[in-house]
């Protein structure tokens, strides 16, 4: 009887030891990348691509480490300090991804300015369904009519200059926002056009008079640019930026691969199939690093308070976002709620990649993200 009890105890001890070793190995596997995701905001992608990729995975690494912490309580509670330390180290990064306060705009706010940033994806111009042509644009205009922003910055803006498509944008927006048809109240710049008829670029519309404007070339020969408009607000001048950093340039095959990836995680050839996406991500990280450097130089030379709106094509844990956000407050962090997701991909994870940053002298109220318009 005593021998049998000893045997049971030995088996139990061996199982606990196996559990401890397995959990420790998993802890290291998910703990190190979480440390790298913390470092992603400081280390340029050109220095370490692995750190940059860990930044993308931050939300998933955070959840994994929380689960590990919970499991250590039942195995060896002293070891939960590993993941707990890493989670606490990332407190600031967590704050960039999740918000619970949701500060609402006061009922009376005479000095408040309503600002909107919107990547309109060419107003859904290339919708493959003929019957849907122009409907995406109308949804956007209806939304603008309801929200009535004082300042709106557009990325992936489209202008049908000759009105050959009967696809009016600039005139319609001026009418919708009840702005004067005067270039002192809007600024648009198009780095790319087709046959000098169809123009693609960025735009800023404002109810406040523009006293100066210009373009910031972020990369030679690239369509990714920033534009700015200095507006007169009361006795102050405020600089508004609308920016669009480089995207990953995923194509149809990449999206199909992404869908396959999410459904076939056990495929031994998965790394080969996703290699193209990996390479595109790596290139995009490094390009955004250089683009942010150019933009920061321009921002540093400005003597006015700044509001910076745009599609960064990068996450809150990224080097690009954190380099730009250093000098500013983030509307989501100051007055947002939830995750603030702005990219809803079918094949890829959802992220916050669009931002409004602003001068630290100002205050933010009622940051919201609309999910009602699909274009």
Residue ranges and their predicted role:
Residues 22-34, 39-70, 81, 215-217, ...:
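Metal-dependent phosphoester-hydrolase catalytic domains
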Residues 83, 87-112, 121, 138, ...:
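Structured beta-strand-rich core segments of catalytic domains in phosphoester-bond hydrolases
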Residues 117-135, 158-165, 249-284:
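Acidic/histidine-rich helix-loop elements
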Residues 74-75, 145, 234, 300:
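Residue-level signal for alpha-helix termini/capping positions
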Residues 145-149, 178, 210, 300, ...:
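Sec-exported extracytoplasmic/periplasmic mature domains
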Residues 114-120, 139-166, 229, 239-244, ...:
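Active-site beta-strand/loop signature of hydrolases that rely on acidic residues for catalysis
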Residues 74-85:
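Membrane-interfacial entry segments at the cytosolic side of transmembrane helices
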Residues 1-17:
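N-terminal Lys/Arg-rich, disordered targeting/topogenic segments
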């Amino acid at each position: 009887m005593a021998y049998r009890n000893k045997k049971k105890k030995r088996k139990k001890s061996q199982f606990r030891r196996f559990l401890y070793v397995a959990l420790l190995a998993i802890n290291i596997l998910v703990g190190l990348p979480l440390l790298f995701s913390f470092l992603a905001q400081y280390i340029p992608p050109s220095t370490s691509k692995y750190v940059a990729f860990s930044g993308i995975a931050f939300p998933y690494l955070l959840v994994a480490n929380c689960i590990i912490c919970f499991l250590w309580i039942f195995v060896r509670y002293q070891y939960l300090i590993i993941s707990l330390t890493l989670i606490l180290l990332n407190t600031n990064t967590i704050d960039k991804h999740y918000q619970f306060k949701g500060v609402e705009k006061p009922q009376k706010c005479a000095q408040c300015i309503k600002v909107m940033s919107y990547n309109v994806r060419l107003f859904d111009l290339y919708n493959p369904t003929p019957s849907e042509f122009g409907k995406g644009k109308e949804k956007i205009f209806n939304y603008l009519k309801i929200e009535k922003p004082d300042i709106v910055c557009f990325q992936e803006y489209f202008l049908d200059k000759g009105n050959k498509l009967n696809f009016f944008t600039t005139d319609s927006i001026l009418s919708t926002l009840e702005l004067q048809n005067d270039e002192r109240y809007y600024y648009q710049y198009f780095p790319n056009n087709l046959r000098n008829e169809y123009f693609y670029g960025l735009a800023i519309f404002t109810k406040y008079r523009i006293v100066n404007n210009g373009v910031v070339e972020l990369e030679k020969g690239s369509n990714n640019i920033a534009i700015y408009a200095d507006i007169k607000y009361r006795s102050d001048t405020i600089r508004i930026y609308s920016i669009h950093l480089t995207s990953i340039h995923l194509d149809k095959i990449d999206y199909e691969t992404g869908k396959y990836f999410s459904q076939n995680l056990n495929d031994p050839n998965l790394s080969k199939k996703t290699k193209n996406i990996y390479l595109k991500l790596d290139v995009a990280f490094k390009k955004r690093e250089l683009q942010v450097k150019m933009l920061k130089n321009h921002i540093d030379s400005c003597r006015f308070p700044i509001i910076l709106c745009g599609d960064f094509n990068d996450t809150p844990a990224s080097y690009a976002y954190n380099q730009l956000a250093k000098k500013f407050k983030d509307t989501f962090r100051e007055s947002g709620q939830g995750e603030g997701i702005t990219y809803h991909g079918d094949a890829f994870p959802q992220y916050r990649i669009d931002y409004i940053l602003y001068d630290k002298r100002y205050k933010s109220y009622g940051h919201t993200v609309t999910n009602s318009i699909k274009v």
